[in-house]
């Protein structure tokens, strides 16, 4: 699949199969995230991979979407505003931009691996 085909194949899915995501696929996805660009390469992010149903159910109390409980795996993206680059002119914090780029890497890598995602 070339890049354009990959981008066309990616969409926000809210229907998931009830099977675990293979560790090799998660490792591949996280390697793609590690290589994602960020301002001054500061990578002001942390990711948490959640695969157990109990924790996913707890997360659903914070993010009330029915489809969340059907996902076999959730990757939580967290931005660290203290670690991100701040533009001198106006002190603009780039954590939101950096994490958005990294999350899109997750979505594209997952799609390439045959997995569905939701932004």
Model regions and ranges:
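Acidic, surface-exposed loops and disordered segments
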Residues: 1-119
């Amino acid at each position: 699949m070339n890049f354009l085909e990959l981008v066309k194949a990616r969409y926000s899915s809210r229907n998931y199969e009830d099977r675990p995501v293979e560790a090799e696929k998660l490792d591949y996805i996280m390697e793609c995230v590690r290589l994602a660009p960020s301002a001054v390469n500061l990578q002001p992010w942390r990711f948490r991979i959640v695969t157990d149903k109990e924790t996913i159910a707890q997360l659903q109390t914070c993010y009330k979407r029915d489809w969340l409980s059907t996902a076999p795996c959730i990757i939580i993206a967290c931005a660290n505003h203290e670690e991100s680059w701040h533009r001198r002119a106006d002190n603009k914090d780039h954590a939101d931009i950096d994490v958005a780029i990294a999350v899109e890497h997750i979505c594209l890598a997952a799609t390439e691996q045959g997995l569905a995602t939701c932004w």
